[in-house]
Design a protein with these regions (language model features):
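Interdomain/boundary linker segments immediately adjacent to catalytic/signaling cores
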Residues: 1-44
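Amphipathic alpha-helical segments that form well-ordered structural scaffolds
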Residues: 44-53
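Conserved catalytic cores of phosphodiester-cleaving nucleases, focusing on short active-site segments
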Residues: 50, 78-80, 90-97
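A short acidic/basic microdomain associated with nuclease active sites
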Residues: 53-71
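Short beta-strand-loop-alpha-helix junction that forms the active-site gateway
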Residues: 95-105
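Acidic, metal/cofactor-coordinating or nucleic-acid-engaging core segments within structured domains
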Residues: 103-177
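Short, aromatic/basic amphipathic alpha-helical patches
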Residues: 177-191
Length: 220
């Protein structure tokens, strides 16, 4: 999910090995890696889709922040910048991957459901504070700093409302408009004014359980 970074990381470790024992240590370390979980693959697919569809810029791969394998980081699944003409704004989003045949699927409901999470991203200042700090630390001193500065200025001048939110549902089932119809209607009263909200359902032709093998084969 972060091929260039992982390749450089592995090459750097290999260059540090000066003895057979060191080489064995590095080999064991690299072999201890795990296959990405389905929800991690889903988040990666969502990032690619939003980049292709909207030109969203991702300044940092969040997988690099994991201290525990498979851990889901707090705050938001998607954190980046949306460019709209000459304007730049923060984009925060959540991703759900589901094989549930129900319509809507269960991943949309409850406190961990997609709609509640989008509601939180729209209105929880404490979450915005955490995400802005996280972004600033990863945009300072590089090519993303001007994007951060412009998006932060827009956020402040709009009292925290001029942002973009994305809710992405990834399915391996048949297309069903009911998956998001009622959820979209429920969000109308939650997000008002200049805030932009986008809900997308993407229906992939291969089973969720096959995604890992497909990615591994494509990378070979």
């Amino acid at each position: 999910m972060d091929a260039a970074f992982e390749h450089d990381f592995e090459e750097e470790l290999q260059a540090l090995a000066t003895t057979d024992m060191a080489s064995d240590t590095i080999r064991n370390l690299l072999n201890s890696g795990r296959e990405p979980l389905n929800w991690e693959i889903g988040e990666g697919i969502a990032e690619c889709l939003l980049t292709d569809e909207l030109g969203v810029v991702w300044p940092w791969n969040e997988n690099r922040d994991q201290k525990t394998p498979g851990a889901s980081l707090p705050g938001a699944d998607l954190v980046g910048f949306l460019k709209s003409g000459d304007d730049v704004m923060f984009l925060f989003g959540e991703v759900k991957t589901s094989s549930d045949t129900s319509a809507p699927p269960n991943v949309l409901f409850g406190r961990s459901g997609l709609v509640h999470q989008i509601d939180t991203l729209a209105n929880a200042t404490r979450v915005h504070f955490s995400l802005l700090k996280w972004l600033r630390a990863r945009c300072t001193g590089n090519e993303f700093e001007p994007l951060y500065q412009e998006a932060a200025t827009r956020y402040i001048h709009s009292k925290g409302r001029d942002i973009a939110l994305a809710g992405i549902l990834l399915r391996d089932t048949g297309v069903n408009e009911d998956d998001l119809r009622s959820r979209g209607e429920a969000l109308v009263g939650v997000t008002q004014g200049v805030m932009r909200v986008r809900l997308d359902a993407w229906y992939l032709p291969r089973s969720v359980e096959d995604w890992g093998a497909i990615i591994k084969s494509a990378a070979a």
